[in-house]
Curated annotation (Swiss-Prot):
InterPro entries per UniProt: DDX18/Has1_DEADc, DEAD/DEAH_box_helicase_dom, Helicase_ATP-bd, Helicase_C-like, P-loop_NTPase, RNA-helicase_DEAD-box_CS, SPB4-like_CTE
Function: ATP-dependent RNA helicase that plays a role in the regulation of R-loop homeostasis in both endogenous R-loop-prone regions and at sites of DNA damage. At endogenous loci such as actively transcribed genes, may act as a helicase to resolve the formation of R-loop during transcription and prevent the interference of R-loop with DNA-replication machinery. Also participates in the removal of DNA-lesion-associated R-loop. Plays an essential role for establishing pluripotency during embryogenesis and for pluripotency maintenance in embryonic stem cells.
Result of altering R518A: Decreased poly(ADP-ribose) (PAR) polymers-binding ability
Protein family membership: Belongs to the DEAD box helicase family. DDX18/HAS1 subfamily.
Uppermost EC category: hydrolase
Residue numbers binding ATP: A223, K224, T225, G226, S227, G228, K229, T230
Localization: Nucleus, Nucleolus; Chromosome
Boundaries of every Helicase C-terminal domain copy: 399-569
Protein name: ATP-dependent RNA helicase DDX18
Biased composition (Polar residues): 31-42, 83-105
One BP term from GO: cellular response to estradiol stimulus
Matching CDD domains: DEADc_DDX18, SF2_C_DEAD
Length: 670
């Protein structure tokens, strides 16, 4: 389809060139100009004053016709009539070979005559060549003006009707943004599935990406979260498999990599809907699933695979029946997140194992130096870059109302409890910095009759999957999570994003708040809780084009449950143990923050931080102890939930051991 406009343009230009050449010939005949024949299309020039006229090998009255039949195209501009200089050897297009053969058959007869003519014209030719070198653009413009004065100009109406406008670039040529406009490019079964999914118009990233990808271009795309990147790469991927008529025996043709299991499941869900009317095989490969069952499916042949990098590399190295040598397309979704979570080495190994002749797509919400490095090793030399939001003032979507609240350390949990209780009928996501912190607050809030769900990296996969779909299908509720849920997940109608613990950097903030206000005309709210010492983080957010305003909270209306919280943590052994783990992990996560000039663990008031976890006296945390040693000692003490009195626990450097008795003078006062 992309060649049709060029063919049409070529035919119309040839037609116009024919008319222009015929007019030029009439003018040349009136001026008594003589044209000399040259072998195989060579052009000689004679000087008439300061004017140059192009000469062809054919007779004067047939010059325009013969050159047009041989496919010759001049460089005349559309708006002006120019007589341009021809190179010493004319370029021959589609029908040139036939013309050369016919001229060669007559070359012997004309050989003597031609030599004589060339010898006679030799002085003039040398003179013409010398003048050729000295001619400037201004002289050629003067020649054009002189020619125009003697040639009858065509009507403006004729110009407008005969000369089409040049097509625009790939990213801006198409005004129609409906999926129906892809009817000549996309299979009708795919369009039918898209219609059944409820989509009629393409988003900006889809509009700019799908057509180039259907042409086989490599692509590096950057767009805000919730902009529709998933369909932007799934539609071309499915079309590639359909057009190549991939069968299970051909193995894997498309590979889609996702940073987290939840995002992989979500992408697989969209792919499943898109493949409703197709017969090709597709599958999900991720950690936490049954590996032997995955290996069996790979042996049978999966045409489109959605996978996480770790499990995929495992199968590529250890599953003999996995055929990926026929791979046609590699898609890396949330490329920056894949690199952030430590899959950089796995990704490089995967790229080395895959065939080099393939189409590659990199999609991400943010562009980092690591993503650029990945693009260099995975994309071809000239990939197409699509940046939807490069020229926009804000890095977050317009429908998002976001702000921050300054809260002292000792009142953080009281603020969170009051906020969740007030918004029980809404859908909220609360982000924490560590798995143990999520686990503790999940147990605590459910214990005090405030039902919440939780997702974190230390859960078993079945639990994570069940919780994820339970929250997706809920009309209201609260999900406590780590950054494992911050990327790519399309959870419907989330009203509030609460960042209880600040993110590691502004890019992570953008991804967290991207879970709300998704899609066209999406609306949502985001709340960032900061300690007074952490207000410097706002400067980094402003540099990243994140507009934040301060929210006003009536502190008199904050629920004062501090005394009840302390009594509960004191009396309930299991909650006490969980609170210790959470406090320890919070301090460690704070110490590992990348922006140490703002999030400095030495500036923390530990007694006040301990109050937010329900402790009157802060548990002991040794930041110099290796985290692996801490985990081993914790397991040696009975796993954190059981009670086993051992010497290792009594000598633990991580936290002080307490007994089941409520009267413990080391931790609590009567």
């Amino acid at each position: 389809m992309s060649h049709l406009p060029m063919k049409l343009l070529r035919k119309k230009i040839e037609k116009r060139n024919l008319k222009l050449r015929q007019r030029n010939l009439k003018f040349q005949g009136a001026s008594n100009l003589t044209l000399s024949e040259t072998q195989n299309g060579d052009v000689s020039e004679e000087t008439m004053g300061s004017r140059k006229v192009k000469k062809s090998k054919q007779k004067p009255m047939n010059v325009g016709l013969s050159e047009t039949q041989n496919g010759g195209m001049s460089q005349e501009a559309v708006g002006n009539i120019k007589v341009t200089k021809s190179p010493q050897k004319s370029t021959v297009l589609t029908n040139g070979e036939a013309a050369m053969q016919s001229s060669n058959s007559e070359s012997k007869k004309k050989k003597k005559k031609k030599r004589k003519m060339v010898n006679d014209a030799e002085p003039d030719t040398k003179k013409a060549k010398t003048e050729n070198k000295g001619k400037s653009e201004e002289e050629s413009a003067e020649t054009t003006k002189e020619t125009e004065n003697n040639v009858e100009k065509p009507d403006n109406d004729e110009d407008e009707s005969e000369v089409p406008s040049l097509p625009l670039g790939l990213t801006g040529a198409f005004e129609d943004t409906s999926f129906a406009s892809l009817c000549n490019l996309v299979n009708e079964n795919t369009l039918k599935a898209i219609k059944e999914m409820g989509f009629t118009n393409m988003t900006e990233i889809q509009h700019k990406s799908i057509r180039p990808l259907l042409e086989g271009r490599d692509l590096l795309a950057a767009a805000k979260t919730g902009s529709g990147k998933t369909l932007a790469f799934l539609i071309p991927a499915v079309e590639l498999i359909v057009k190549l008529r991939f069968m299970p025996r051909n193995g894997t043709g498309v590979l889609i990599l996702s940073p987290t299991r939840e995002l992989a499941m979500q992408t697989f869900g969209v792919l499943k809907e898109l493949m409703t009317h197709h017969v090709h095989t597709y599958g999900l490969i991720m950690g936490g699933s049954n590996r032997s069952a995955e290996a069996q499916k790979l042996g049978n042949g999966i045409n489109i695979i959605v996978a996480t990098p770790g499990r995929l590399l495992d199968h590529m190295q250890n599953t003999p029946g996995f055929m990926y040598k026929n791979l046609q397309c590699l898609v890396i979704d949330e490329a920056d997140r894949i690199l952030d979570v430590g899959f950089e080495e796995e990704l490089k190994q995967i790229i080395k194992l895959l065939p080099t002749r393939r189409q590659t797509m990199l999609f991400s919400a943010t562009q980092t130096r690591k993503v650029e490095d990945l693009a260099r090793i995975s994309l071809k030399k000239e990939p197409l870059y699509v940046g939807v939001d490069d020229d926009k003032a804000n890095a977050t979507v317009d429908g998002l109302e976001q702000g921050y609240v300054v809260c002292p350390s000792e009142k953080r949990f009281l603020l969170l409890f009051t906020f969740l209780k007030k918004n029980r009928k809404k859908k909220l996501m609360v982000f924490f910095s560590s798995c143990m912190s999520v686990k503790y607050h999940y147990e605590l809030l459910n214990y005090i009759d405030l039902p919440v769900l939780a997702i974190h990296g230390k859960q078993k996969q079945n639990k994570r999957t069940t919780t994820f779909f339970q929250f997706c299908n809920a009309d209201s509720g609260t999900l406590l999570c780590t950054d494992v849920a911050a990327r790519g997940l399309d959870i419907p109608e989330v009203d509030w994003i609460v960042q209880y613990d600040p993110p590691d950097d502004p890019k992570e903030y953008i991804h967290r708040v991207g879970r709300t206000a998704r899609g066209l005309n999406g609306r949502g709210h985001a709340l960032l809780i900061l300690r007074p010492e952490e207000l410097g983080f706002l400067r980094y957010l402003k540099q990243s084009k994140v507009p934040l305003s301060e929210f006003d909270f009536s502190w008199s209306k904050i629920s004062d449950i501090q005394s009840q919280l302390e009594k509960l943590i004191e009396k309930n052994y299991f909650l006490h143990k969980s609170a210790q783990e959470a406090y320890k992990s919070y301090i460690r996560a704070y110490d590992s923050h990348s922006l140490k000039q703002i999030f400095n663990v030495n500036n923390l008031n530990l007694p006040q931080v301990a109050l937010s976890f329900g402790f009157k006296v802060p548990p002991f945390v040794d930041l110099n102890v290796n985290s692996n040693e801490g985990k081993q000692k914790k397991r040696g003490g009975g796993g954190g939930f059981g009670y086993q009195k051992t010497k290792k626990v009594e000598k633990s450097k991580i936290f002080k051991h307490i007994s089941k008795k409520s009267s413990d003078s080391r931790q609590f006062s009567h």
